[in-house]
């Protein structure tokens, strides 16, 4: 007897290295989204760092979290599909984990499938310095994700896994949908992002992270009065810009592929 197969429409997108799968024409509130996403992300499947589900102008992330890079990817897809798009256009979208409408400025980057997308990011709820065991971390809270800033030069810790376990323990009595740890090198303005999504029950080292870069930008503004910086990511770059007390994240987006994915039920 044949197993049933679920057929989904997908678009694979590269926002600054943070490989993202967007699933179209699907119930964005389906209860199986976390399980489906886990299957889609596998190395033996489409192989990505995160999955989002899109309908009209809304993006629903796999764990109900907010994601800046997926939002930039979604707006770039809208430009890619927009017959009226030529060089530049602004797109208003919404994303899970964030109640406000997001404004994304999309520009062509030299090819039909390549864009630069600048998103106005949500403001943080709180910014503080905390101590976790003997380590000092920055903690920037947003409505859809909590980001920890770990300065690897200052803390001199070689085991990132140890820090991840300590942060999980720190958050054990809190309600949250996702957390990130930005392992930041202050010498060369580079970072290695780790993001854990509670609903999916796993975390990944991402090749870039827009909300994490936002958190780092707010942190650097507070600590070093730095309004703008290009932050080197493991597989690309993202620039944060603070203008008139608003935070923007800018960087490249490339539409890689689209087609159908087959998932065994």
From Swiss-Prot:
SUPFAM superfamilies reported for this sequence: Diaminopimelate epimerase-like (SSF54506)
EC class: isomerase
Regulation: Activity is not affected by buffer composition (PO(4) or Tris), ions (SO(4)(2-), Mg(2+) and EDTA) or the PLP inhibitor hydroxylamine. However, the activity is hindered by iodoacetamide and Hg(2+), which are known inhibitors of enzymes with catalytic thiols.
Catalysed reactions listed for this entry: L-histidine = D-histidine
Keyword Lipid biosynthesis tagged: no
Mutagenesis or variant effect for residue 67 to S: Catalytic turnover is greatly reduced with D- and L-histidine
Record key words, sorted: Isomerase
EC number from the UniProt entry: 5.1.1.24
Active-site positions on this chain: 67, 209
Job of this protein: Cofactor-independent isomerase that catalyzes the reversible conversion of L-histidine to D-histidine. Shows weak activity with L,L-lanthionine. The catalytic turnover is 10'000-fold faster with L-histidine than with L,L-lanthionine. May play a role in growth of F.nucleatum.
Subunit structure: Homodimer.
Family: Belongs to the histidine racemase family.
UniProt miscellaneous comment: Was originally proposed to encode a lanthionine epimerase that catalyzes the conversion of L,L-lanthionine to meso-lanthionine, the last step in the lanthionine biosynthetic pathway in this organism. However, the authors found low catalytic turnover and low catalytic efficiency, suggesting that L,L-lanthionine is not the physiological substrate for the enzyme.
Protein name, per record: Histidine racemase
Organism: Fusobacterium nucleatum subsp. nucleatum (strain ATCC 25586 / DSM 15643 / BCRC 10681 / CIP 101130 / JCM 8532 / KCTC 2640 / LMG 13131 / VPI 4355)
Lineage: Bacteria, Fusobacteriati, Fusobacteriota, Fusobacteriia, Fusobacteriales
Gene assigned in the entry: hisR
